């Protein structure tokens, strides 16, 4: 296989030397881009974009045409697995995701199939193959999945939640039932990510969006142990390639040492965690990804540039940092601010990498 032209992102994840800090954005393909909004309108709905490999490829490539990003990320959704398990995922206009069926009883868990990545989820693998070909080895392609805990919250609650009352009720009343669901999801996520790697993904990321709503003990028991099992099951060497794995728990700053012990290569951190302190705590074991508040992009160019410089300075000299936002970019951001952000990372990071 020919070498990726710009492998800065992969090298940073493995804490190898780079010439400047790599940068990409969570949700870099999305509603803040007018070309995305146009394509989504033409497609009719969000799931059509996800389930049509050519459209998913086009959306994935859109931000790379505008900005000098160091990685592409598969355009998909974390809820593809529960949808393939038969829960009936829909996205209403202006609404979040909703499931027609929810998981409430043991029989519901027992009835869940393990989706075939090249069967019910073939559209995702076809998208990976299509994108990988279109990228022509210019930058790496990131594959991803939701964490078992985060997927379970949607499957039990039936959609997005603020209180997480149903799943927490299950956690405290029927922990065995919840563990059964999480075990099944961990097996499915492992299979799903390995299939993405086989289809061409160069790195994978697990999004634990809702891990931060758990107590210290519950996080270890109901979220981290299942992500750790997935990390252990992922093909880290495939077809002559080393596949780095990033774990991201939003609101997970207190658990960095425990996350680093999972065996992952990198940890995503949000803006509530000090990146300098995070590096001091776990930088000898893992790379760090983050961690600018997406709201900074509401500021003008001077504000964005100053914040980029501040975070670079906080991280300090050497490799092991992938610059990103602390969560996904929001739809109200002007693309011009993103260009300022990306260009500032490249412009001001080089001095931190001079040996």
Curated annotation (Swiss-Prot):
Note the superkingdom of the native organism: Bacteria
- What are the protein's GO molecular function terms? uroporphyrinogen decarboxylase activity
What reaction does this catalyse? uroporphyrinogen III + 4 H(+) = coproporphyrinogen III + 4 CO2
CC terms in the record's Gene Ontology section? cytosol
The keyword Lyase is assigned to this record: yes
Annotated residues for binding of substrate:
27-31, 77, 154, 209, 327
**Keyword Lyase belongs to the record:** yes
What protein am I looking at?
Uroporphyrinogen decarboxylase
